Swiss-Prot record:
EC nos: 6.1.1.15
GO molecular function annotation: ATP binding; proline-tRNA ligase activity
The protein, known as: Proline--tRNA ligase
UniProt keyword annotations, A-Z: Aminoacyl-tRNA synthetase, ATP-binding, Cytoplasm, Ligase, Nucleotide-binding, Protein biosynthesis
Subunit structure: Homodimer.
Amino acid sequence: MRLSRYFLPILRETPKEAEIISHRLMLRAGMIRQEAAGIYAWLPLGLRVLNKVCDVVRAEQDRAGAIEILMPTIQAADLWRESGRYEAYGKEMLRLKDRHERELLYGPTAEEVVTEIFRASTRSYKDLPKNLYQISWKFRDEVRPRFGTMRSREFLMKDGYSFDIDQAAARHSYNKVFVSYLRTFERLGLRAIPMRADTGPIGGDLSHEFIILAKTGESEVFCDQAYLDMPVPPPSVDFDDVAGLQGVVDAWTSHYAATDEMHDEAVFAEVPEASRLSARGIEVGHIFYFGTKYSTPMKAVVTGPDGSERPVHMGSYGIGPSRLVAATIEASHDEAGIIWPDAIAPFDVALINLKVGDGACDTACAEIQAALETAGLSVLYDDRDERPGAKFATADLIGLPWQVIVGPKGLAEGKIELKRRASGERETLDPVDLPARIRRL
């Protein structure tokens, strides 16, 4: 993609309303634009990142045996009355009526809808377990939306829901998602720490938040530093191995970890002083087991092995891809701009032509772009008629993992320059060696 033809409305000045670094950088890098309080348009660069985050989330959900569906955003109020949550949810839920005066709502979550889908189509324990998920836009009318896409009113959410015959089976489904989330965040270049959490309006008696550490995090967290080096299960992890999966979850919940809401100073004091870590953190995922909280009032039942009907045991599991984009920036940036992990960078390579119009530079850049794309790498080619300093500033701001710098001096010696954005390391090499060099690193 040539930058001269791309839609990248970069801002030179930081908008005054942007309070945290991710919001500032997403606006400056032309990733998003605000349309109303807490509501954003995703522009091409931001959408590429968002789609890549969704691809990783989707791949790990599928690996764990979850099945993707898509449910309506506009939901019937009667379903929420049936579960008992219509009045309890409060003003965060946007309520409306259609032309026939039927009461509807803009779904902030989908436990009721997925339970209705399940009960209408599943009758026997032989059809269990099931884990259904979707990736869709949600709306919660926050009193004070702030921090850009970190706490917006409209947001993209992966919400999953499991159905099992009993508590033991439901706990295995919970563990599957627990491990899949560890793998998801690892692939996104994030170290997420699971912490016991309050179940809030979702309900239930078992819940974990997944928290990444960041200086600008919204929550204070307390944990054992052992979490920073714990191994994440590999792609070969067997999600059907009940005991093995429970062992992974036990290992990842054996050390102290709590947000300020759940913090117990006396228990934390038992952690060796050298291992205690107090920091700021950002919630990037939340999982719940809530038993029969929804299935009982909504009569989501199956026939068990003994022939009697029983309500299914359920769990729900959330990751916010739009929030994850901002959280990644909070955890990975410097004074010059964003530093994208390879897995979700909008492009792999920023190709910088230092002298547009120079025959040798133009030809070399065209050949390099073709070679990189043939090797499966995505390239954003800065072919604008701008000063080198402006091009370097743009490349650093948008944070692509690699910068390939082509100028007349280097080409006179048959060389180009390669820079790694994360480390700042530079090297010179022959253009023909470039694709293999990037692939190897």
